[in-house]
Amino acid sequence: MHDFFLPVIKNALLSLAVSSDKPVLIERPADKKFGDFSTNIAFLIAKESRRNPKEFAGELIAHLSFPPDTIKSMTVAGPGFINFFLTPTFIMQSVEQILLEGKGYGRSCLGKGKKAIVEYVSANPTGPLTIGRGRGGVLGDCIANLLETQSYAVTREYYFNDAGRQMQILGESVRFRYLELCGVAETFPETHYQGAYIREIAESLFAGHGAALQGVHDLLPFIKSAETIIFKSIKNTLERIGIRHDSFFNEHTLYHREGSGQSANEEVIDLLREKQFIGEYDGATWFLTSRIGQEKDKVLIKSSGEPSYRLPDIAYHITKFKRGYDLMVNVFGADHIDEYPDVLEALKILGYDASRIQVAINQFVTTTVDGQSVKMSTRKGNADLLDDLVDDVGPDATRLFFIMRSKDSHLNFDIDLAKKQSKDNPVFYLHYAHARICSLLRMAALENGFDPDGSGHHLLQLLDSEPELRLGLLLLEYPQMITASIRLLEPQKMVDYLHSVAELYHKFYQECPILKAEPDISKARLFLSLATKQVLCNGFRILGISAPESM
């Protein structure tokens, strides 16, 4: 509906000789007495120009020229809000458009010609994927899906490091277990990886090489074998919940020198040094963030010579700019909350437009059964494993539960609820709404010869009861829900919206006879059901969940 209101409001502002860069937001009021849609643009402009908001809203209404039979009435409420009441005919004409656009409903050209990169999961190949990484993975995947609806050319990227200290520990862990299989008894360090997967990797090595590697002290064969097996496991786990990446970026390339040239990390240090933002003290190399008002400087290279996370992250983001991305979305866990602002500051200092970078921080996940916290660790090690969760509740519940709470909130993943076959389970509730419509359409085809691809969309304009109009209006919100979800990097808004669609459809189904109604009304209500099904399907595609036709 934004595209319907925007040009009319802009023309009215022009006729009033009012110029403003304030965005025109069209929203659904929480209370229907305040209209079907509303805008606060009059309030914003009046505040900016020191005018009386109510008076200016009245002037603006007088200059709004909508097509006939679209707006029933307009009112001014509160401090300059303009409320719009639509005609039933126009509401249902707009629902017709949903049927015409089909899978394309909600899509736009907002990002046409622009490149976006979404980086998510990005777990180093040191072990199986945890539930926490899974939440970030689903969040990133949904954000990428949302951006694609707006015509962005999206790259899904996985960033990893196979050359750090943790990989050394991984190699040592595998070697210890391998030596045990060779009959060499050594004490396994408590600081090393304890999971059963380490023994499985060692068993794979032993099966292929026997005891031939017993005298090999170079960790490389142990590291590479572990990396290959673990990465295959990670990719398989992600594929189980519908996540596939387009590219894998190895942090190790940022340390690599071409010929006699510098590595990407070294180049960052030199560029920041030229800007006088590098200091050397306490045996370490520091990013002088105290120069930009921060309390402490931040270490880039530790006294051991090992880079901190910040240095390769800065270099990595520079590669994204060099690769020509217009929008860069990073999905991080809560452990990155203190680090990423320093990366953005460094990029600004180096002349990059950090506003092209958006960061989504997702909070921790706990799993509960019978209200008690549990570990999903039935197979390997003492960790909450994503594979075990998917085994228990399935891919759809895994995905939806991960994003049905705000990314900013700690998530309590209720295993019992995720497995429940009732309307209390959000996944079941959404699936049931879609399956109910599919069942209705099958029955209509059988009993009345209804053709969902046939003519008669205009019959929708016969519908004017409150349940029908409320459902129709909600379906018209779908495109705005996409843009709001993108603006906030919050797929949860889409989950809440689709739940509302399912809820209103169930009410409409109960209150408005469909198959037993007069033929034209019956057909109109079937088309309204079909439009609802289309919105649910389009939304499910963004969330990455299935759309069952029967239950």
Curated annotation (Swiss-Prot):
Q: Which residue numbers does the motif 'HIGH' region cover?
A: 123-133
* Entry GO MF terms: arginine-tRNA ligase activity; ATP binding
Gene3D superfamilies xrefs:
Arginyl tRNA synthetase N-terminal domain, HUPs, Isoleucyl-tRNA Synthetase, Domain 1
Q: What class of enzyme is it?
A: ligase
**GO cellular component annotations of the record:** cytoplasm
Q: Where in the cell is it found?
A: Cytoplasm
* Domain of life per record: Bacteria
Regarding protein family, the annotation reads:
Belongs to the class-I aminoacyl-tRNA synthetase family.
What NCBIfam families does the record tag this protein with? argS (TIGR00456)
- How is the quaternary structure described? Monomer.
Name this protein carries in UniProt: Arginine--tRNA ligase
